[in-house]
Amino acid sequence: MSSIQSEHFMKVLFALLDETFDNIHGFYLDRNASLFETLVNITADEASIPVGGKCATLAAQVKHVAFHLDYIEKYFRDPNPPQADWGGIWRTVNRVTPEEWQSIQSELRTNYNRILNLFKTAPAWSSEDEIGIAIAVVVHTAYHLGEIRQALCILRS
């Protein structure tokens, strides 16, 4: 099996990241279905409703993605980052005000931009861990985007 050239990997990685977060390219999402396109139409009240009564709120889903991006950046720079409290967000993010909801979305945007910059300036994709981390950002975010979009179907029905 031949290896892929890093520029091909990078081109596809950035296209998938862009589609997942911002602009549809036709890889896997329908029009107007990226994460930020989805979030722009969610109110703080909607973001505060736990779907199914015991499940996470949309605000917690978004805060978790922002937290994940922050942690991934730290891990990419140092494979031994401090221990993360992965359950903290699910336990603490519930009802949000419009200002808090906007702040969570801004945090997500900031962390996403930091990940983009990190990936763009990475000197070489020389390890499977680095490639795995990059792919995990797309996959993990796509999973939560699906959770958010499914929750919206329930909340708005």
Labelled PLM ranges:
Residues 3-39, 45-89, 125-157:
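Short, contiguous alpha-helical
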Residues 91-125, 132-137, 141:
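Acidic/histidine-rich alpha-helical segments that form the ligand environment
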Residues 1-2, 105:
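N-terminal capping/interface segment
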